[in-house]
Amino acid sequence: MAATLGVAASSPVLADELEFQGRRAQAQALEDGGFVLRWPQGERRIGPQPMRTHTASPLFDALFAMAQQEMADDRVEAIRDPAFNDGKPVPCACFETGERWPYVWTRDVSFAADLALARLEPERTRNALRFKLSAARDGQTPGVFVAQDTGSGGSWPISSDRVVWFLAARGLLDDKAFAEEVWEALQATLAQDRDAVFDAQIGLYRGETSFLDWREQTYPEWTRQDVRFIAESFALSTNVLHYQALRLAEQLARQHGDARASRYAQWADALRQAIATRFWDAPSNQYVSYLGNAAHPVRYAKVDLLGVSLGVLAEVFPKERARAALRGYPLVAGGSPVVWPQDAEQPIYHNRAVWPFVSAYALRAARQLDDAPRIALELQSLMRGSALAGSNMENYEMQSLAVHVEEGPRSGPVVNSPRQLWSVAGYLSAVLEGVFGIGADGSVTPKLPRTLVPLLFGDRQQIVLEQGARRYVLQRPTASAGELLVAGKVEQQGQTTLVYLIGRKADTTAPPQPRQVFAPSTPEAPVAQRQGDGHRIVIPAGTTLYMDGHALDATRHLDLREDGRLHVLSLARRADGLESLHSPALTLGPLQEVPGSEAWVWTATRAGQHRVSLRYRNPNGPINTGVTAAVKRLLLECTGQATQSQVVVMPHSVGEQLSTQVSFTVVAGQQCRFRLEDGFNMSALAHFAQYNGGRGGRDGVVNTAQVSALLVGPAASTEAAQ
């Protein structure tokens, strides 16, 4: 295994250098405590740093110093972005996102804080997090909210992972004033998300995968020009972040003596169960990255390393399934790609890429599960990437760990930046936690694969981490048994913690390295031909037909009789042991279209649940960015019944399309009236008042769409999809 995975195996004696696929990096220790790092494209001098490791590998020690240097380089007193304040500096004693990204983004700074910044630079990290809190512009809407940055279809609620902010904030609650800000933001943000993106039928929160936010890179190609599906879908990573936020809300509510603590706990318990059940795909022994919408909640054959790692760390998965999912996550030459399988037609970015911050989360998850092979491979992948690039880059091509591979239209990574903040934090985390086992709470629980002993210890009996006046010493084990080295006896000698490592048995099953890395191409949408009192849907060879959330046994065609309900169908192709992403969906059944822009009168012809959407245009911004997704409240008023209310979303569109679907329950024969009320989108936050990259910034709140009709029809059951 070591020969396949290891830095140690590639150069067990010359621990000052690393060679990978014909490229070499080398480090030299200097007398002043600094280092010189040389890599294929250059050389840099790294000065002495506040923290220092003493191992058998000058390269390991130098890369830790480089991460500290790059964290210092990411410290700024002002930030800027062309889309805000006309690109002029905005005062903020915080961190910029990277050399090419001199601004603060909610997702980036939050993951970076959770990995390392909160423990190393707490006050500056609080400043960065505070920058992403905002009241509403109108001065009347109560509460403080976490800002969802510009994004797919006009931002929130298409993207709904802003709750990652609370993952970072939970490590900074020792400051009472900040803790109160966190509590205030939790209440408002969670209430808003519960109203706008929680689906009570499915039990999950809707919205885009966290971090994987470039539509066709990881979602089907057909989402490139229509992000409604993304807004309606359910993502593993985003739901785990909502779960963690709910647990924090429960904790803070109890501290405040707030009766809502029990409600937050109930919500979290139910969400944990829904995550564990709905995302688990038994045939692949894996948790999928996302599901289809509530009308068709199929599991898409895509897994993502961040989602799996966050789920492991949050303990939302049953232990054995967690082990199986992480152990079974595929490996390629450069490490663990952030998604699996890959798309042969997409350029390199999230597709076909290793992202260091995600590798750091996988390392953290592997430690939690005592997965020695995964701990080793993630540490080594992180070392290779930063050493061969001479910086903690944003991302790398997954096989070569190159910062750019030329392949015509599929070249990439399409975007890349040196000293990317979350990559820097990921590397720091890998050393502090991954090697020395030092937790943010001061605990020392090393879990070091024995395969790394030659690299780190060489002929030494100890390796050392100096952190200010504190010293952490790991003593080499005397016995050779056990694949995972953990803490035995621990001695405290003044400011020095001495840990005697002992061997523990661990599963040494290496991750799979599949030869086939590309998914089959996505099929076209199913085609239905009218036949008698129903439809015949032909099933092309090599594809599986899904209906209302589950696969059908039919192999050549399906004859679907009219039953008075809406049915949703899609196709997926299977080849070489892999399944494609799903085709665009086909909806069959009695769908009534009622013209109108704000109010509609309608009489239900049958009782039960109905699905409703709006036909609209939203030309307020491009499909890939902005803050002006139209968010409205659709009310249903039926004679003798309580008013029902749901949030409907109309993302930026390319021409005319349908909004997100919502569900209402009606009684047959009742006359009902639908009407729209205004909602809340990100342009309503004061945070975006200086946004000049599109509408909804300096021109004021923009929450509009051109609605032409309402579509309504009886819903089919999706229970078989659970």
Where are these regions (language model features)?
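Acidic/polar, glycine-enriched structural segments that form the non-catalytic walls/loops
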Residues: 6-102, 176-179, 187-195, 251-260, ...
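Extended glycan-interaction surfaces of carbohydrate-active proteins
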Residues: 20, 54-103, 127-155, 198-233, ...
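Extended, well-ordered alpha-helical scaffold segments
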Residues: 59-67, 121-134, 177-196, 241, ...
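Aromatic-rich carbohydrate-recognition surfaces in CAZymes
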Residues: 102-209, 235-243, 353-380, 406-437
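Non-catalytic C-terminal accessory modules of carbohydrate-active enzymes
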Residues: 365-368, 373-534
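Short proline/glycine-enriched turn/loop motifs at strand-loop junctions of beta-rich domains
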Residues: 532, 538-544, 607, 618-620
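Extracytoplasmic
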Residues: 557-565, 571-722
